[in-house]
Amino acid sequence: MNRELKSRKPKAGLLLIASPRFKNLSGPQRGTYNDRKLKAVEDIKSSMDFLDLSYPGIIYEREDAEKAMKMFSDNEVDFIVAEFLSWSEDFAWIRFLRDMPAVPMIFTNVVKDKMSFETTLDEDDFIDYLCSGTLVGSLEGSGSIRRIPRANVKVVMGTRDEVTEKIRVFSKAALTRSVLRHSTVGLMANMNEAMWSTYIDNYDLFTKIGPEIHYLPYSDYGEYIAKLSDAEVKEYADELTSRYKMMEDVAYDKFIGCVKATLAIKNMAKDNDIDCFVYNDIDRATFKTAGCRAGFYPQWFNDNVSVLVPEADIGAGLVTYMLKLITGKNVNFIEPFHVEDEFGTFAGGHAGPNDHNDPEWQGNVLIARDVRFAKTSWKYAGAPFAWYRISPGMKTMAGLYEENGKYKLICTQVESLPGKHLLATYSHTIFRPVVPVKDLFERILKIGATQHYAVVDGDWTAELQDLAEMMGFEFYNLK
């Protein structure tokens, strides 16, 4: 899937319902109800410049609702923003709820700090009073959402600025949902026989989450390694050595072996149009084919809004990809290692390829031997990798897991602490969670998970919650 489709503005259908009974009512100075609503619409649209809007005009009649449905369907909107501009007859709204194809919707009610009128004795003030009856319209319309019933509707209320921010959050989740349905997961080349808990149902993956899955054989991997040009290998090797210090005990020929193993994955992802590359980096066939496991993370994945994850964990790959789509940031793949109760912290990280390309933290990366496999008999045993002390700061930690045909999305906030490189073979950091560390993991153990999580700078729990609700996931925000 090309980058432009993954990084575009969310497409929203704007559904604004108003009363045909009030439409032509007029005051002597400030125009008709319709004139005032047209001005209100311009203010609403101007607050949504972060969206690619489909706006069919104010919905007064059945024909307006039908026009809106056709426009939204033709334009393949990611979601719908629905708002009553005052009290209104509800026939057009109910028809829309019944007939509009399934798409997420955010149903909004906007409150004002203060009314523009004190009494309704003046005719213009009376029209303003009618225009201000958004609450009665929303209350009237809310029951039909449940009675139809209409799935995937989020109800929000607040000032215009507050509602706009909630729409912004919702839009990121809705775009992610749409992109997932056109994405491709590439698994090289089989499930992880060492970790059965990572297995998921691939039919459900497509029908309930969206991506297709393609299996990428090791025979292809070997061919991609073999056809790498010397110039291509040298270019990437020089890029890495110019950016990062290489430790003295790294053998250069083994470094080149790892560069080749990494570049072949990038080229396979590119040629097969893979958005989420799930790499079984501990399978013996990986080492037999490449002589080592890939240890670097080509910037191509970030440029293409794609991800690369290890250990054949499709669920962990998906949550990494979701966070990539939502945030556009560098996302890291971790497993919690151990708790240090004295400090209220846990160590976490992972071996294998991990995104080390954050431009602000290039000083946290060393090219170091993968000592875990240094004493094996594989061709490039002890080949190096990008040893990354994961960037400090507050992060969202999230995991996605399958249980009996349902999915669970678990997230929390953790602080990555600054410090030196500590754990050989693993990109890593020390985390201090906002929840007391023993309580956090006891709660996760009771929910039931696996060991793999994605972490990214910032708080994205609101976006993850909206996405989970759209996708029908169980959602756990541990705080």
Spans of model-derived segments:
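Glycine- and acidic-residue-enriched helix-capping/strand-helix junction motifs
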Residues: 20-38, 128-135, 193-198
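Periplasmic-binding protein-like
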Residues: 77-86, 106-108, 274-280
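Short, acidic/small-residue loops that bind anionic groups at enzyme active sites
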Residues: 86, 95-122, 127-137, 299-312
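Long, internal scaffold/assembly segments composed of regular secondary structure
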Residues: 237-326
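Cap/lid and interdomain-hinge subdomains that line or gate substrate/regulatory clefts
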Residues: 10-12, 113-237, 243-247
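Extended hydrophobic packing segments that form well-structured cores
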Residues: 38, 375-479
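Short, well-structured alpha-helical segments in soluble
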Residues: 65-77, 94-97, 262-271
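C-terminal catalytic subdomain
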Residues: 302-421
